[in-house]
Amino acid sequence: MTELGPVAWPPAPIRTERLVLREPEARDRAAFIELLASPEVHTYLGGPRPRDELEREMPGAPERWPGSFVVDLDGSMIGQILLRRATEHRRPAAAGKVDLGYLFLPRAWGFGYASEACVAALDWFAAVLPGEPVVLTTQTANVGSMRLAAKLGFTEAERFQAWDAEQWLGLRSPVTPSA
């Protein structure tokens, strides 16, 4: 995965009705550790990382790189949105396209935050790199992620076996940002 391309980074914080998408900050470290160590979050992502390992290895201020947004609710991190160019993706249909990823703390599930944050990130992306398609990969067993992909307008490009499970690759064609 590499950078998005000719995008000014960081953008101004992106505000939605309930959320703010912003760059990671030092105050987010504990939430990142919680997110990466959560068995619930990583059910379909190969399992969580050991908390003690994360405590040792994670820098005081989480890494900042183009396409990495913290999802903030009332001043606290509840998740992360990732937009990264898939230069080395295993599937030809995804290679070179921007890949959408998202992780949310379990306490934030079921409130529509993922949908709200992803729509905002995709609208921002469509405004700064118009005409670019976006891909998303998830396990077909991850019902919530499959539902979110459909809600966001991703359509099936292919299914394939990887990581001992059936994977779903979706494509979202370029759209005009919503007003």
Language-model segments: residues:
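Conserved beta-strand-loop-alpha-helix junction that forms the acyl-donor binding cleft
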Residues: 136-146
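Conserved active-site tyrosine of GNAT-family acetyltransferases
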Residues: 149
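GNAT-family acyltransferases
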Residues: 1-107, 119-124, 128, 133, ...
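Conserved acidic
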Residues: 96, 113, 141
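Glycine-rich acetyl-CoA-binding "A-motif" of GNAT/NAT acetyltransferases
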Residues: 76-79, 114, 144
